[in-house]
């Protein structure tokens, strides 16, 4: 297995001669103005943990989408990233999260505006595997319960760093500050590919805003004959050009 780190988009890669590959990213804003050497070290540690979680599944013969979900799980649970716990806050001070999971055969599931799902990528997977739909906006508590995914109060997702960033944005700072949308793409031993993305959006975004991450072809895309893509950046720009599909 080989690993590498690339900045400013913090990226980790694992691959082998068998063809299995896992690439993860912590987003374009993961090393922002609030970064310290200690925080950067924690980010790199969490990235390695995420890489290991997904890659071990690939080595055991698991399909690509399971490796993607496992890697994203670790990052959603780590408060340094803008996904799950540690998500950026909306203008009304809540965590409102999006996620998407897509496989190379064109099957896809996504959620937007979830505020109590502990791991939004699990909800995206549930939409893909348990419903006939592609995208759910602000699913009900009953729907979430039916999917069998874990939940938390919204307070669980909110960190002091995100509160500070929101206060700065609302006092005239950079309201479009990026905080590191996360993602993963994988290729399994059978040659199948998958992509997943999870995000809390942009600090101080309006309630109900939807970025590129949960939109197939915009922030997340997988096509067996071409490529698997997970994007990070300003979602509005990606949506306008259907960026992931253009790669």
What are these regions (language model features)?
Residues 2-246:
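Alpha/propeptide regions of enzymes that mature by internal proteolysis
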């Amino acid at each position: 297995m080989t690993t590498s780190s690339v900045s400013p988009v913090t990226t980790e890669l694992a691959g082998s001669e068998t063809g299995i590959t896992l690439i993860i990213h912590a987003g374009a804003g993961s090393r922002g103005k609030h970064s310290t050497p200690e925080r950067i070290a924690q980010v790199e540690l969490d990235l390695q943990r995420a890489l290991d979680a997904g890659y071990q599944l690939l080595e055991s013969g698991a399909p690509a989408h399971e490796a993607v979900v496992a890697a994203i799980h670790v990052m959603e649970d780590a408060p340094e990233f803008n996904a799950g716990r540690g998500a950026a806050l909306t203008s009304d001070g809540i965590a409102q999260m999006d996620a998407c999971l897509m496989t190379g055969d064109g099957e896809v599931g996504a959620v937007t505006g979830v505020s109590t799902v502990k791991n939004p990528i699990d909800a995206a997977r549930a939409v893909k595997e348990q419903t006939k739909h592609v995208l759910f906006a602000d699913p009900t508590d009953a729907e979430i319960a039916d999917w069998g995914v874990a939940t938390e109060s919204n307070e669980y997702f909110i960190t002091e760093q995100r509160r500070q960033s929101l206060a700065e944005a609302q006092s005239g700072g950079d309201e479009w500050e990026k905080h590191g949308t996360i993602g993963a793409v994988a290729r399994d031993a059978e040659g199948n590919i998958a992509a997943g993305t999870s995000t809390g959006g942009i600090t101080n975004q309006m309630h109900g805003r939807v970025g590129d991450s949960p939109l197939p072809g915009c922030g997340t895309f997988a096509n067996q004959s071409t490529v698997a893509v997970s994007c990070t950046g300003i979602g509005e720009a990606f949506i306008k050009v259907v960026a992931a599909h253009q790669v």
